Every structure is written in C-alpha cells, then in structure tokens.
Amino acid sequence: MNPEVRAAKVGDDEALLRAHQQVWKRKHILRYYYETWYKLIDEALLPGTIVEIASGIGNFSSRADRRKIIATDILCGQNVAVVTDAHYLPFSPGSISNFVMIDALHHMAKPMQVLARAAECLKPGGRFVMLESYMSPWASLVFKFHHEKSDYSYDIYNPLNHMPQIWYGNAAMSRLVFDRPERLPLIVESIKYLEFLSYPLCGGFTYRSLLPAPLLRSLHKLEVSPLFANRFLGLRMLAIMTKL
C-alpha cells in the first residue's frame, strides 16, 4: 500500500483525499494514466460551460491547458468551487453545456437520480461525459483483489438497505446503469472500453507499482488495440451521453 494512504485514518474521508493528493504529486505513472484519460474526455466536450461532478481532489479541473471548469464535490477541497450533493445539483434547468464525472458513479447511492438531475440542468444537445470502472468478464477477476467489491443485487432506484456500504463503492454500478440504456434520461452516443492490465499493475492511488514506469507505459501502448480495449477485457469505460 502507498505510505500516504496507509497513514490516513480509517473513516476520515478528508484525510484520505489529502493522501490521494500526495500520491498524485509523487507518482508520475499515475498522472500518466489519468492524463491519457483526460485527453479523451477533452476531445468529447462541447464548447460552453463545463461542470465536474464529484471532483474529489480536483485534478481534472486544475489542469492549466483547459477551459474553466466548475468543480463540485460533497466535500470541501482546494479546487472545489461548489460544495453540493451530486443528487441535488444546484444549477438552473437548461444552463450547462457539459457535465464530467470521473471515477464517481460507483459511489452514488441513487445513480439514476444523479443522471436525471444532470439531464435537467443540461442544455438541449449538451453532453455528459463519464469515465468509470467497467465490470467486464476480465474485470470480474481483477476486482477480486480490489478494495471495492461488486454487488449486482444493488437496487439503483431504492438503495436504502445498502446505504452504509455505497460510500465505499460498488464496482458493478456501471453495468447496473448502462446495461439497459433505454432506462437512461440521456441518449448514449458511444461507449469506449479502456485498459487491460497495466493500470492495475501501476497500483493506482492505493497501492505501489508492481512494475517500473517505462515498462508500464510500453504495455499501455499495446492495450489501445481492439484486441484488449473491448467489452470483454476492458477495465474502464468512457461513456458519452447527450440530451436531445
């Protein structure tokens, strides 16, 4: 485990966020992966207002080469502009051009409510760009060694019996939400599947890298091939949704 994360007090969410910020500053290979994903998100965004939902430590919104982003989160943070619950976004109907959400859907108690509220706030033709873990057949094996478990019994409409657990994440959430796109309040334009093996080997925010950074980068370049980047082997998904 990364020493910064080990030192964070269990149950202290603000301490864990600070630990993640320290890991981000120190761990070059972690920034490499996220910058790769940020570029894909950038390419999908439309001109106009950009709001990030559940921004965490705010790495996406703090990039200097980006248009201004309104970062929101349920906790205060260095780059957080609006402190709010994602289920009750405080924006006027039809006022936002883009919503972005990165690695947060699996923490949402009522993900359909979050999407419905975002749809209300989007302008016609506006986009919701989401990067999220994806429980492919391969991922179901990888996540057996991950601290966030998958629960396919979770009721995305009435989760009250699961409320204490959802804060720690449900890796199956993207499947529960996107496997039936006809239920979504937005139109799914595209889903791109990402990653295979190199990112887990880098350890993410929580664990130490298992391989040297140059080797991880080389492996990652191979993983962009459709041989690995597909719904059977992908570990992540980039979903682009639009409001009609």
Q: Which role fits each region the language model picked out?
A:
Residues 1-87, 234-237:
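Conserved N-terminal segment of class I S-adenosyl-L-methionine
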Residues 112-127:
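A short glycine-rich, Lys/Arg-flanked "PGG" loop and its adjoining helix->strand segment in the class I
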Residues 186-244:
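A C-terminal cap/extension of S-adenosyl-L-methionine-dependent methyltransferases
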